[in-house]
UniProtKB/Swiss-Prot annotation:
Keywords: Acetylation, Proteasome
Keyword Acetylation: yes
Residue numbers bearing the N-acetylserine modification: S2
Protein name: 26S proteasome regulatory subunit RPN5
Domain PCI: 233-407
A biological-process GO annotation: proteasome-mediated ubiquitin-dependent protein catabolic process
PTM (free text): N-acetylated by NAT1.
Native organism: Saccharomyces cerevisiae (strain ATCC 204508 / S288c) (Baker's yeast)
Gene this chain is encoded by: RPN5
């Protein structure tokens, strides 16, 4: 069982180690096993004396002895045994594991199976030990990289997502964020968007207010864009892109902000109409940078002006520009975005018509919307259910009524207002008649 080091060691072995290490080095040249045995004797003495500094030196020496001679199986065995020794110091175990990790990193020629076996040994030794949780996380990441190179994405995602790095108090914030971002990315590659969403909530967005996390912020919001695109949550995509757009590294470089601002426009026009969508699209319209993007500016203007649009004309005008964009409209994968854009155009037209007409025939409405009767009724039903417009369809008469019926309170208020207005007019007329009578009386005299 491991333990914390006491404030003061029972005995200082530093001088003894200085004398013994040269002898052990000499012995190791001919008999590695005997050298290892002597080091294990020293390890026991330093451990029992609670001499942390000397214990670290001995454990590091054991790692050097075995790793430098490629005795990785022996190293795995010693790492397992020494970590279980009674009274073993926590910091000594941590130091030994760190030394093994250094050798793993520097041994580029090490065969894959051996590398995996050492990583797995470290993972077993560090399991459920808080004082080596960071080391466990780092070797797990190395194992995940190997799995990714082998194309085992699902396995890599499962291994990495086991780590609850957000609870690691000894890990730097930037490293925590990097781990969670990689967990999110692997979950997306695996196709588990629900897990990716859960993982994204482990990062506090206010953390990104610190400029030193700017690159991580961009990576984080790009991953959120992928998640929301999969869910077809266009308004969320636009909001995440806006966070990217507001980042100094993007805002200061025209080559970077132009595509981001274009994407914001595209996903705002793809978003269903609502208070937030309407607010955001008007804010974007007032952005001075939008003037440098002619096509995008004119597209925003179409959706913020109370005028009807013809879908065939919109498609013909913007198709060449929009098809160049791989994220929003280009390629077969984004074909459904064109369908959604057509829906938004029709919904915009229906809102405009509901403002200008109190009643309209279905035949005329079909002509204005370029739709069949059943399609028109479907769109009316959808917008009514969303609470965006009021409409009632009289099927026998084939008339659509957009005028909302007034309740008793509204009718009473309107009647009261009309009566007040009528009395004011009567009073004004009375004054005018009196004035005329006076003028006529003066003229008669």
């Amino acid at each position: 069982m491991s333990r914390d080091a006491p404030i003061k060691a029972d005995k200082d072995y530093s001088q003894i180690l200085k004398e013994e290490f040269p002898k052990i080095d000499s012995l190791a040249q001919n008999d590695c096993n005997s050298a290892l045995d002597q080091l294990l004797v020293l390890e026991k003495k330093t451990r029992q004396a609670s001499d942390l500094a000397s214990s670290k030196e001995v454990l590091a020496k054991i790692v050097d002895l075995l790793a430098s001679r490629n005795k990785w199986d022996d190293l795995n065995e010693q790492l397992t045994l020494l970590s279980k020794k009674h009274g073993q110091l926590k910091l000594s175990i941590q130091y030994m594991i760190q030394k093994v990790m250094e050798y793993l990193k520097s041994s580029k020629s090490l065969d894959l199976n051996t590398r995996i076996s050492v990583i797995e040994t470290i993972r077993v030794v560090t399991e459920n030990k808080i004082f080596v949780e960071v080391e466990r996380a780092r070797v797990t990441k190395d194992l995940v990289e190997i799995k990714k190179e082998e194309g085992k994405i699902d396995e890599a995602a499962d291994i990495l997502c086991e780590l609850q790095v957000e609870t690691y108090g000894s890990m730097e914030m930037s490293e925590k964020i990097q781990f969670i971002l990689e967990q999110m990315e692997l979950s997306i590659l695996k196709g588990d968007y629900s897990q990716a969403t859960v993982l994204s909530r482990k990062i506090l967005k206010k953390t990104f207010k610190n400029p030193k996390y700017e690159s991580l912020k961009l990576e984080y919001y790009n991953l959120l864009v992928k998640i929301s695109l999969h869910k077809r949550e266009y308004l969320e995509v636009a909001q995440y892109l806006q966070e990217i757009y507001q980042t100094d590294a993007i805002k200061s470089d025209e080559a970077k902000w132009k595509p981001v601002l274009s994407h914001i426009v595209y996903f705002l026009v793809l978003s269903p109409y609502g208070n937030l969508q309407n607010d955001l699209i008007h804010k974007i319209q007032n952005d001075n940078n939008l003037k440098k993007l002619e096509s995008q500016e004119s597209l925003v203007k179409l959706f913020t002006t109370n005028e009807l649009m013809r879908w065939p004309i919109v498609q013909k005008t913007y198709e060449p520009v929009l098809n160049e964009d791989d994220l929003a409209f280009g390629g077969e994968a984004n074909k459904h975005h064109w369908e959604d854009l057509q829906k938004r155009v029709i919904e915009h037209n229906l809102r405009v018509i509901s403002e200008y007409y109190s009643r309209i025939t279905l035949l005329r409405l079909n002509e204005l919307l370029d739709l069949t009767e059943s399609q028109t009724e479907t769109y009316i039903s959808d917008l009514v259910n969303q609470g965006i417009i009021y409409a009632k369809v009289n099927r026998p008469a084939k008339i659509v009524n957009f005028e909302k019926p007034k309740n008793s309170s509204q009718l009473l208020n309107e009647w009261s207002h009309n009566v007040d207005e009528l009395l004011e007019h009567i009073e004004t007329i009375g004054h005018l008649i009196t004035k005329e009578e006076i003028m006529h009386g003066l003229q008669a005299k």
